[in-house]
Amino acid sequence: MAERGGAGGGPGGAGGGSSQRGSGVAQSPQQQPPQQPSQPQQPTPPKLAQATSSSSSTSAAAASSSSSSTSTSMAVAVASGSAPPGGPGPGRTPAPVQMNLYATWEVDRSSSSCVPRLFSLTLKKLVMLKEMDKDLNSVVIAVKLQGSKRILRSNEIILPASGLVETELQLTFSLQYPHFLKRDANKLQIMLQRRKRYKNRTILGYKTLAVGLINMAEVMQHPNEGALVLGLHSNVKDVSVPVAEIKIYSLSSQPIDHEGIKSKLSDRSPDIDNYSEEEEESFSSEQEGSDDPLHGQDLFYEDEDLRKVKKTRRKLTSTSAITRQPNIKQKFVALLKRFKVSDEVGFGLEHVSREQIREVEEDLDELYDSLEMYNPSDSGPEMEETESILSTPKPKLKPFFEGMSQSSSQTEIGSLNSKGSLGKDTTSPMELAALEKVKSTWIKNQDDSLTETDTLEITDQDMFGDASTSLVVPEKVKTPMKSSKADLQGSASPSKVEGTHTPRQKRSTPLKERQLSKPLSERTNSSDSERSPDLGHSTQIPRKVVYDQLNQILVSDAALPENVILVNTTDWQGQYVAELLQDQRKPVVCTCSTVEVQAVLSALLTRIQRYCNCNSSMPRPVKVAAVGSQSYLSSILRFFVKSLASKTPDWLGHMRFLIVPLGSHPVAKYLGSVDSRYSSTFLDSAWRDLFSRSEPPVSEPLDVVGRVMQYVNGATTTHQLPVAEAMLTCRHKFPDEDSYQKFIPFIGVVKVGLVEDSPSTAGDGDDSPVVSLTVPSTSPPSSSGLSRDATATPPSSPSMSSALAIVGSPNSPYGDVIGLQVDYWLGHPGERRREGDKRDASSKNTLKSVFRSVQVSRLPHAGEAQLSGTMAMTVVTKEKNKKVPTIFLSKKPREKEVDSKSQVIEGISRLICSAKQQQTMLRVSIDGVEWSDIKFFQLAAQWPTHVKHFPVGLFSGSKPT
């Protein structure tokens, strides 16, 4: 911290000879007050003398602090063009007092809510409203953060003897200060001070004459560039008295850009591995404009400079290399530029000479050498822990598209090729290896990316969703496509980064294998991975075709689309419907994963928010059609509940969901029971038979588009379906770790027991239902020989038929039955059992038995439009066969039904289900999505947030069937 140059000297000169560390400041002779010509001038420190001799035209002031402060913050003030000695003479207009003052105040790096910002303040005029002491001939303007000891003072401003005066100023303060985001501690004090005096002698310290406050939070939101008057007041017997006014010309608070070259030169944040106090407290000129090759030459890597940089880098130690890890960005920029191919030449490699290929191999060799230097160990965690070793990351919101250019082989290859630049946050070696893989795929598979070079029109804010937490190159794609449609297969997934390698295959392959062999939670470096129901989606990113289709629908911020049709295209049924709708230019978005569903709904919510911000009237509800199975609707429901939990309740009316069933769909069956027109549209035999086939029909047997659009255009009534909560307690994949919980909303059916083995809707405690959006239960998978005849139609009710239909599944992990304990509590309506007996509704009820299946439904009874606040449970238990002599049998013995007993319990508000044996793990199907490795689960009839209903559109004027 620099001490103030002593205008007026006194004992110790500036600050009285404080032992404060930092750069000293010289005081120009022009600033000496004429009243004290006899006092000796403070000698200039040796280090400062060099700086003073190089620029004799500028004088300096300093940022001062109390003598007790030990902060290592730095401040430098430069004053120029000050008034002539003796002040303004008679008849002469005084020149404005010009000073430029700079300071950098320390920032609490341990707090995530404290960020550095740059504050700029320009003062134009000082007006004294009250006559001060007669011997007051000079004042000082100082700035200070409330609660801080750091003070930045100007040079002394000479006041004429007339008393009430106006002094023209050209005073600029530039401060890098700590801004606290979560507490009201951003008050900047503008103080009018004078030197302390004792018996007509100047002594150490300053006396504050008046103070004015500036709220930095308001300045950050509303910068001011016009004339602004700040009143300075003093307290006399607890009464505020105006003393002076300061006219402010400009006032702003800006974030500090750590990405620019200038910030790279002047960023004094210490490296994690090389922290030193000396580095922090010195504003070294070696870092600013230095010719030292360690600081200056790695900023840009053009082709002719690359060889020189390589030779110099090979001489560096690993310690110095670690401190400059961000330069890998520029290295990749240069490498990608070398592969830049013009459109006229094409994407062939015929024009590339062997010498150029050898040079590229040399460059890659050098790059991997540097990567090994940054990560000398092959063990897993270090690679993620040093993801940002330049400085502590500052809190910020990441846009959805951030990182896509590093990881998508199809969406952003065009921008990499044309711009030759990378996105942000590409310093981790894992992402660098992914980039290498993208580049090699681009060289070998050019035809795959010819059509993917268009610029996206959707902005970053449109795609800001939950899926943006981690975007990395997927190692494997989990969206099996059964159709050969080019528009769906050509960009089905980012899987095409797998395959070929560059000539550096020997070195790149082991690195890739090391990364992919680690657990997924370590590769994504996310502590929430174990608890996220969409863990597997961290390895996926939405395809470019999804954004293109969104661009055609979300045309303008001024208007919202009337309807959007989401189609699950992971099976032939969805592809078939999507192709028919696209042929007639309907607003269709084809999705293959939960990430894409989230991207579409997030963009839609963002557009609704923009519309509400720009219009006083409420928007009409946007109709969102979900064309797919029950598991597809479940993915939409999960995002809807999670996104709207942080919004106000009026957002619940901005969207209306339309359910178009493809295959088994309990929710659709219930909707058909309360809406006859809906039932005749989607639940008749023609629709059911069409989508129960194993392959698409050759010709269109019925008007699919007509039925869908009839529903989309005619659904004017909103039916609210209650949202229930399922809490799954899952076994951790590591034996020594504790179990963890997942909270999943549902509106349909939860099953446990002999659920059908559907790999398309599998999810477990370690992996989310990535493919829970895929094959519905009507289409048998290609790798399974299970009989699906019992599930070709939707279940008749939340009743026995659906439960009994799954009894004969040969691949069930439980065999024929499973021992369960079901504890349940009854709600207000009470319990109605088929046997007719009654129980105490206030106590817990327990069922312990050997079950064939347990099924819990949140849907109301068929035909009942009025919603209930409870659930219904259907259990199928195994009964022992009674040994009866055949002589007494008058009829042929019944077959398998004699072994099973069905029981329906209604009015349940809460339920807990667990296996009798503690080591037995359950498989639970929630709205068609299967979760495994479940220790036990709990169901509640109501979701805990204000999102308690799911709005579904039905035909107007419909009557229950």
Swiss-Prot record:
Positions bearing N-acetylalanine:
2
* Extent of Low complexity compositional bias: 20-30, 51-70, 768-802
Compositionally biased region (Acidic residues): 274-291
- At what positions is Phosphotyrosine found? 249
Which InterPro entries does the record associate with it? Answer: Phosphofurin_acidic_CS-1 (IPR019381)
Q: Where is the composition biased (Polar residues)?
A: 404-426
Composition-biased stretches, type Pro residues, lie in: 31-46
Among the record's GO biological process terms, what is one?
lymphocyte homeostasis
Swiss-Prot/TrEMBL keywords: Acetylation, Coiled coil, Golgi apparatus, Phosphoprotein
Residues carrying Phosphoserine: 28, 377, 379, 428, 493, 517, 526-527, 529, 532
For the keyword Coiled coil, the answer is yes
User: Pfam families under this entry?
Assistant: C2_PACS_N, Pacs-1
Which stretches are annotated as coiled coil? Answer: 351-375
- Annotated Basic and acidic residues bias: 260-271
Bias (Gly residues) = 1-19
* Entry's Gene Ontology cellular component terms: COPI-coated vesicle; Golgi apparatus; perinuclear region of cytoplasm
- Where is it localised? Golgi apparatus, trans-Golgi network
Q: Which residues carry this modification: Phosphothreonine?
A: 44, 502
A GO molecular function annotation here is:
transmembrane transporter binding
For region Disordered, the annotated ranges are 1-70, 76-95, 260-297, 375-426, 475-540, 758-802
Summarize the subunit comment: Associates with AP-1 and AP-3 but not with AP-2 complexes. Interacts with FURIN. Forms a ternary complex with furin and AP-1. Interacts with PKD2 (via acidic region). Interacts with SORL1. Interacts with WDR37.
Function recorded in the entry: Coat protein that is involved in the localization of trans-Golgi network (TGN) membrane proteins that contain acidic cluster sorting motifs. Controls the endosome-to-Golgi trafficking of furin and mannose-6-phosphate receptor by connecting the acidic-cluster-containing cytoplasmic domain of these molecules with the adapter-protein complex-1 (AP-1) of endosomal clathrin-coated membrane pits. Required for normal ER Ca2+ handling in lymphocytes. Together with WDR37, it plays an essential role in lymphocyte development, quiescence and survival.
Q: Which family does it belong to?
A: Belongs to the PACS family.
Protein's recorded name: Phosphofurin acidic cluster sorting protein 1
Q: Which organism is it from?
A: Rattus norvegicus (Rat)
- What is the gene name? Pacs1
